[in-house]
């Protein structure tokens, strides 16, 4: 079993996008399902994942490093789901790219708000 097959089996959304063009290079099966995507060719990450027409104002591309994850939280306005996000600079087919792992914590957030 190769790495892509393993990533496709995860419950977390995992995607890779080109650092310079924002082109969506890969998204795992759970990500495709959550975002309603089939064919990702020529899609920009900001359009496919956030429904935006230009790069996200909260994009972390400029601060990503190869040796550590940048961890943050965000609510996806397209799906209205809340995520813990882990972003990292990687090489994908020889080019710099962004790896993002998104853990959906919406239910946990809803419970926290209801008991607060």
Regions found by a protein language model. Give the residues of each.
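Sensory modules in modular signal-transduction proteins
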Residues: 1-22, 29
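Signal-transmission coiled-coil "S-helix" linker that connects upstream sensory/regulatory modules
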Residues: 4, 8, 39, 109, ...
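Sensory input modules used in signal transduction
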Residues: 16, 86-89, 102
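PAS/PAS-like sensory domain cap-loop motif
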Residues: 31-41
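Residues that scaffold the ATP/ADP-binding catalytic core of kinase and kinase-like folds
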Residues: 34-35, 48, 111
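Terminal output helix/cap of sensory domains in signal transduction proteins
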Residues: 47-75
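Per-ARNT-Sim (PAS) sensory domains and their PAS-associated C-terminal
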Residues: 65-84, 90-96
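Sensory coupling linkers of modular signal transduction proteins
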Residues: 95-116
